[in-house]
Amino acid sequence: EEIHFNWQGGEPTLLGLGFFRSVVKIQQQHVPPGKRITNALQTNGTLLTDAWCDFLRKNNFLVGISIDGPAELHDAYRLDKRSRPTHNRTEQGLKLLNKHGVEHNVLAVVNRRNGERPLEVYRYCKRQGVKFIQFIPLVEQLGSTGQAVSSTHLASGGQSPIDLVTKCSVRPRQFGNFLIAIFDEWLRHDVSRVFVQLFDETLAAWGGQSPSLCIFQKHCGRCLAFEHNGDLYSCDHFVEPEYKLGNIHQ
């Protein structure tokens, strides 16, 4: 009964508030009978203002804030184009969301640095008053120049997958230990008070329920991904030339 739009990037707020006002207007004009449209926005929060938050609240946007823990950990990799730290601006965005009553959650990318300090990351998120938390692993493939490249192919030429990812990528066992440490604390203190997506989805699948997160489902393809130029993919985990389904302008 619902049609979900998930606005991601890059940084979707760079499109401007006027763009999203137009989006909502078009959605209202074309929503099919009996359906309801929902919008979610994933942002680093640095461009949020009172005007942005007023719009997001009035139009029932769910906002995900990308923040990787305390400043020391967050700013290790999240610098702006001028190589300036962004943590203070992201925190200010969180405060604005709270001020305006915008529904929001936090997404923390687990990397080689903060992957060693799981409880610091988890407790930091809780201190921000956040009740819903996502953790996703940073896994970037090395290109021939030694720089990160976008690709889904992490094994080639007989090399170990570890040799094919950037130094800032979280290691498999490290990510596992990160989740275990947080799970133990969550189980002791925070069940029904804090919701960690990965734990909820895993427990739902274990209990025989159908998970809502696509990576836990039996079949892929329920969440289409559109690029800014109209290119269409069956999943945002496979936005690669060989997986392109077509273009909506063709």
Task: Please give the residue ranges for each predicted region.
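Radical SAM enzyme [4Fe-4S]-AdoMet core and its adjacent flexible, acidic
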Residues: A76-N88, K95, K99-H219, A225-N229, ...
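Conserved glycine-rich "GG(E/T)P / GGGxP" loop and the immediately following alpha-helix
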Residues: E1-P137
